[in-house]
């Protein structure tokens, strides 16, 4: 009941965004049930137009594009959730350590975060990804390691404001444990963490798509970025409206997902 009450209080825009994101999540979970063919099956005739047997046709290798798109939901959404959760958790933990351990730790971690923020995240991520082994695990690791500083900076400021409050100060005075202090801080910090998790998922999809598009992602992962790259490599993409069923679906999947995440955490005027 409490959850329903909270949903009713949301604006129409945010409810639409939540519905879209729920659709993405369910599609990612249930994709194997709806995929007519395996994403690795290339036994079909190449470059078939959309029809009853292939809703979005086939690519140059004979893969069913609809199956590749659904598989992209699985891989890209899972990668976004894992990368978003880990980068948010890492940034929040380091922010807590900076505030809890004192001035020396705060200065060191803040300087370290500022060092990462000098160069745009995407530039650093692409540079490191070029030299790392092209696996999905390394893609997640690179995204997490180079996208936590912004989380750290904002959450650190929030914790500094909250740690001077009476509840936390009383816990510190009574020699409470680290977990006791964290428990007192969590209610005040949780809304910021939730917003950052959504934003980090947003960035993870954009970064993975960019890495796959430029050929430095996992070559075996059937993601939306990989499908977009394959479509762009097809020399006759814009002949006979091929782009409408080859390029537009994965681009639309990325754009709708990213925009829905962004609008979900954007304050309305």
Language model segments and positions:
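Periplasmic/extracellular loop-to-transmembrane helix junction in inner-membrane transport proteins
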Residues: 2-10, 37-83, 229-249
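Membrane-cytosol interface at the C-terminal ends of specific transmembrane alpha-helices
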Residues: 84, 103, 134-182, 192-201
């Amino acid at each position: 009941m409490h959850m329903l009450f909270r949903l009713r209080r949301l604006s129409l825009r945010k409810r639409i965004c939540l519905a879209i994101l729920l659709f993405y999540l369910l599609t990612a979970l249930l994709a194997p049930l709806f995929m007519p063919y395996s994403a690795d099956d290339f036994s079909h005739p190449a470059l078939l137009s959309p029809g009853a047997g292939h809703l979005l046709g086939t690519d140059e290798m004979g893969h069913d594009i609809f199956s590749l798109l659904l598989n992209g939901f699985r891989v890209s959404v899972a990668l976004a959730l894992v990368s978003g959760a880990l980068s948010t958790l890492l940034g929040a933990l380091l922010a807590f350590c900076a505030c809890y351990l004192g001035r020396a730790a705060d200065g060191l971690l803040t300087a370290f975060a500022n060092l990462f923020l000098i160069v745009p995240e995407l530039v650093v991520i692409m540079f490191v990804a070029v030299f790392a082994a092209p696996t999905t695990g390394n893609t997640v690791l690179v995204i997490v390691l180079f996208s936590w500083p912004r989380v750290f900076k904002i959450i650190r400021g929030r914790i500094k404001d909250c740690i001077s409050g009476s509840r936390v100060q009383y816990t510190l005075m009574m020699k409470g444990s680290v977990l006791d202090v964290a428990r007192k801080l969590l209610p005040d910090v949780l809304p910021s963490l939730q917003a950052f998790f959504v934003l980090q998922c947003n960035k993870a999809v954009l970064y993975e798509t960019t890495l796959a598009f430029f050929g430095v992602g996992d070559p075996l992962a059937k993601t939306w970025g990989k499908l977009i790259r394959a479509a762009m490599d097809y020399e006759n993409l814009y002949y006979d409206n091929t782009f409408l069923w080859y390029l537009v679906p994965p681009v639309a999947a990325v754009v709708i997902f990213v925009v829905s995440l962004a609008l979900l955490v954007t304050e309305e005027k």
